[in-house]
Amino acid sequence: MHEPLPSLRLLNNGSTTFGLATGGTMEPLYAKICKTDIDFSNCISFNLDEYVGLEANHEQSYAYYMHQHLFHEKPFQASYLPNGLATNPLEEAARYEALLQQHSLDFQLLGIGQNGHIGFNEPGTSFESLTHLVTLEESTRQANARFFSSINEVPTQAFTMGIQSIMRAKCILLIAVGETKREVLERVLASDYTEEIPASALTKHPNVIILTDLQVEENKS
């Protein structure tokens, strides 16, 4: 698997806007970044998603995750996440999308779920979707239950950038690690372009980098 840090260094040559992701896949990357001299003090970040119902200092909120894994060592000029405690979630989703549209994402980090979700865009999400409120699939809640005391504590809803929101980024870095991601990555690379595999939207983006530890072949047909 190629090292993503050179890509970040090339981008990090001035005011840059990053879309950031969370989860176990990103932890080694953020740990490496924290040991470098990369400076984000002139940069802006937008997080891909956030749970509904968790305050920012909750240990499983993505605001807390970002502080623990990156922001405490590498602060940005400004860092934006959806407000998990917003009194009107639909208005909060619209507010966050409007904020995104005021900026242009230079670089978007993504992981991929076993069902092909990117962010919390579950199978069946429209490729035209903007930032929205989503009810999480049971498979996604099960996958994230390891971070909570029990699955009953895993939120049932989340905010997520929509697929169209993600696709506006100038460059996308998708990281897929481990055998559990093989099947879905092979389907994406086989150009199985369908809303039932949200990540397949990336095949239509002009500048996507895929980093993986898997030996997979791209279907050239």
Swiss-Prot record:
Entry GO MF terms: glucosamine-6-phosphate deaminase activity; identical protein binding
Gene3D superfamilies: 3.40.50.1360
Top class in the EC scheme: hydrolase
GO-annotated biological processes: carbohydrate metabolic process; glucosamine catabolic process; N-acetylglucosamine catabolic process; N-acetylneuraminate catabolic process
The protein's name in its UniProt record: Glucosamine-6-phosphate deaminase
Stored SUPFAM superfamilies: NagB/RpiA/CoA transferase-like
UniProt KW keywords: Carbohydrate metabolism, Hydrolase
Active site (record annotation): 49 (proton acceptor), 115 (for ring-opening step), 117 (proton acceptor), 122 (for ring-opening step)
Pathway the protein acts in: Amino-sugar metabolism; N-acetylneuraminate degradation; D-fructose 6-phosphate from N-acetylneuraminate: step 5/5
Recorded catalytic activity of this chain's protein: alpha-D-glucosamine 6-phosphate + H2O = beta-D-fructose 6-phosphate + NH4(+)
Gene behind the chain: nagB
Chain's role: Catalyzes the reversible isomerization-deamination of glucosamine 6-phosphate (GlcN6P) to form fructose 6-phosphate (Fru6P) and ammonium ion.
Keyword Chaperone tagged: no
Induction: By N-acetylglucosamine.
Top-level taxon of origin: Bacteria
InterPro entries: Glc/Gal-6P_isomerase (IPR006148), Glucosamine6P_isomerase (IPR004547), Glucosamine6P_isomerase_CS (IPR018321), NagB/RpiA_transferase-like (IPR037171)
Gene Ontology cellular-component annotations: cytoplasm
PANTHER family: GLUCOSAMINE-6-PHOSPHATE ISOMERASE
EC number: 3.5.99.6
Key word DNA repair present: no
Family: Belongs to the glucosamine/galactosamine-6-phosphate isomerase family. NagB subfamily.
